[in-house]
Amino acid sequence: MSETTLILAIESSCDETSVSIIENGKNILSNIVLSQIESHKRFGGVVPEVASRHHVEGITTTIDEALNSANTTMNDIDAVAVTQGPGLIGALLVGINAAKALAFAYDKPLIPVHHIAGHVYANHLEKPLQFPLIALIVSGGHTELVYMKNHLSFEVIGETRDDAVGEAYDKVARTIGLSYPGGPQVDNLAAHGEDSYDFPRVWLDKNSYDFSFSGLKSAVINKLHNLRQKGEAINEANVATSFQNSVVEVLVGKTIAACKNYNVNQLIVAGGVASNKGLRAHLSSACESNDINLSIPSPKLCTDNAAMIGAAGYYLFKAGVTADMALNGYNHMDIEQCSIES
């Protein structure tokens, strides 16, 4: 293995086609992202078949662009990393098959990467991970608290018992009447409202780090339905603020409690919802008050991208994790199954 390790990484788990060249797990030489938001906006959400077709159309040119932007060739690449799951199976297979083709044609190791592990390692691209740490994972499909003793060590200490936080945001956004993608729209609207609606904060058991957002989601939907039935005025900004404050209060409260209990050196935030301005502000304030070292990636690294897959892929490569040409994609994958004890 050369002193400088270059990873070509591919991410296609949902509605972004992305290819990145990462040096030594931390330096981004290129990170090309093709977004499909405009294509899915008219449907009000991601349509799996449409997503897969866009990946097929864009994957080859995205690979070429990533290599050209990094001023490198496949001969310089040490390994090919690709998202194995979780995600939309058709979308995943486009990236996996492209990665297999490159690995086979150029005789490079093939590295399977868990999508959420990638989100965790997005932090490492801007600020070194400091173990032990707690990772708050917040996305459209995941809400988890993960304890990490060291690189590639994942222990889930809390998770949602029903809806993921991003799922709740999207449903509330649609009920308010906001366009896709709903999460950022709610966040932007919440900045202009007041916490005037009494929505529940679901804490569950006293010592539990688990989450539940289905009750809150239903409370918001029912409140809006009842107000509309009565013909009463709805302050949409206040609804957004009240909903977001309910979400953020629970997320921050449980996360800070976990950090104290596990005596960690760092709190990192991972996933698309990590770009939420309200969450970032509340976490920053809480961590400052409790003397907790906080790391949240830049918004461009919170959403799906291949740079994060390359960062995680580098450490998997160093640990000797590779796959053969039988590599498959999966809708659901437990991050603990990807844990490597060093």
From Swiss-Prot:
Entry EC number(s): 2.3.1.234
Molecular-function annotations in GO: iron ion binding; N(6)-L-threonylcarbamoyladenine synthase activity
Alphabetized InterPro entries for the sequence: ATPase_NBD, Gcp-like_dom, KAE1/TsaD, Peptidase_M22_CS, TsaD
SUPFAM superfamilies on file: Actin-like ATPase domain
Keyword Flavoprotein recorded: no
Keywords: Acyltransferase, Cytoplasm, Iron, Metal-binding, Transferase, tRNA processing
Annotated binding of substrate, by residue: 137-141, 170, 183, 187, 276
PROSITE patterns membership: GLYCOPROTEASE
Protein family membership: Belongs to the KAE1 / TsaD family.
Matching HAMAP family: TsaD
Protein name, per record: tRNA N6-adenosine threonylcarbamoyltransferase
